[in-house]
């Protein structure tokens, strides 16, 4: 042990700053959130209440609505973004190297924009007045304008649609790079057997991309659970009758508008447990021993 420490001591020293930042800015806040979730914590006082905050959440219709909205948003958006990223990457893969580089940059470019700015653009598109872009297009083809984010029945659908139509550039780049490393021998063997383009894509490309798909699935799910700025900007923090409220939005308002830090921490703990549980299920379902 002593010899190993002397041999690798410098390595530990280089890792130490990153580990310290992780402890201070990630691990300690998580521990503090778990501790606060068991207290009736406000700005000037704190009282131990055990699991009462979680009981309050179970009985709160607004939290149940936020939970349902978060789950629905995540299911639709994650499935759509994974599919879009895979399809777009598959379409640009047969192109030449320069064309691939151009399209990868083109689809990745929106990621460098501010999420708030992107949400503001979508708010203008789905503006409920007749001058919103979506209603202008509907009017041009003879349809009546919709209320979109101004309606409790349509607001969540508009938010989900805005996320779905935002092609995930990061996924396109990762899928495209992974496709470039797939063994050509498998495709050549399939061509000898008379396999068509779709057959090769479905039975060779998609299965071999399972590690990349698993990574993107976990990342996209966590990001979907954490959706905040899109809802906050497009629907003013929840929309009509809390139609678009999500768990993170409710955590924000509960903590920083009403000062109920204990209850907000309980919501954050529920979201954390959800994310971990879903990630475990995803890893168990999609983990693969594929090597190439």
Feature annotation, model-predicted:
Residues 1-6:
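Short, Lys/Arg-rich, polar N-terminal cytosolic tail immediately upstream
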């Amino acid at each position: 042990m002593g010899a190993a420490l002397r041999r690798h001591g410098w390595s530990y020293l280089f890792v130490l700053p990153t580990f310290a930042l992780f402890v201070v800015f990630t691990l300690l806040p998580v521990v503090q959130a778990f501790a606060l979730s068991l207290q009736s914590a406000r700005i000037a006082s704190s009282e131990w209440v055990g699991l009462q905050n979680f009981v309050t959440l179970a009985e709160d219709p607004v939290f149940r609505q936020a939970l349902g909205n978060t789950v629905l948003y995540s299911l639709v958006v994650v499935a759509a973004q994974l599919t879009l990223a895979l399809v777009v990457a598959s379409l640009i893969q047969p192109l030449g190297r320069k064309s691939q580089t151009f399209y990868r940059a083109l689809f990745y470019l929106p990621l460098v924009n501010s999420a708030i700015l992107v949400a503001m653009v979508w708010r203008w598109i789905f503006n409920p007045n007749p001058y919103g872009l979506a209603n202008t297009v509907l009017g041009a083809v003879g349809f009546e304008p919709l209320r979109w984010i101004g309606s409790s029945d349509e607001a969540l659908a508009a938010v989900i649609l805005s996320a779905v139509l935002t092609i995930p550039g990061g996924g396109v780049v990762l899928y495209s790079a992974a496709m470039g490393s797939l063994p050509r021998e498998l495709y050549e063997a399939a061509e000898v057997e008379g396999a068509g383009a779709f057959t090769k894509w479905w039975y060779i490309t998609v299965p071999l991309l399972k590690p990349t798909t698993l990574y993107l699935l976990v990342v996209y799910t966590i990001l979907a659970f954490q959706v905040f700025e899109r809802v906050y900007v497009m629907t003013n923090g929840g929309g009509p009758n809390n139609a678009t409220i999500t768990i993170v939005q409710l955590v924000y308002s509960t903590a920083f508008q009403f000062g109920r830090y204990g209850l907000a921490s309980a919501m954050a703990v529920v979201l954390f447990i959800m994310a971990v549980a879903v990630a475990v299920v995803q890893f168990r379902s999609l983990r693969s021993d594929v090597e190439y």
